[in-house]
Amino acid sequence: MKSVFTLSASLAISLLLCCTAQANDHKILGVIAMPRNETNDLALKLPVCRIVKRIQLTADHGDLQLSGASVYFKAARSASQSLNIPSEIKEGQTTDWININSDNDNKRCVSKITFSGHTVNSSDMATLKIIGDD
């Protein structure tokens, strides 16, 4: 009976360690300061081209309004993909995961993510944090 309990406890601890390791796969790709006026050239350039399968957006400071986003891949043709993003993100709010590389070509790496948008309801600039999952 003691060995069954020990085995069960070991499996439970292994499961916890497994899940925490997966949670650490999410990486902050960068933070963008959102101006007060609508801007369509806000770019997050990744210094090292990396495979990113999905992203989350968080309004770290202030509310922001987004009108578009695109992902650019390192490829001979400079391929890109428009993203379906929410139009507003309130301070402290995080979006659901937004899938990229949806054409099943998971070998393309992301070199740049661009955004169009601005800060709303604040005299300070809002900040947009981009979290990636590979």
UniProtKB/Swiss-Prot annotation:
InterPro entries: UPF0412_YaaI (IPR020240). The keyword Signal applies. The keyword Lyase does not apply. It holds the Pfam family DUF2541. Keywords: Signal. Residues 1-23 form the signal peptide. Belongs to the UPF0412 family. This is UPF0412 protein YaaI. It comes from Escherichia coli (strain SMS-3-5 / SECEC). The gene is yaaI.
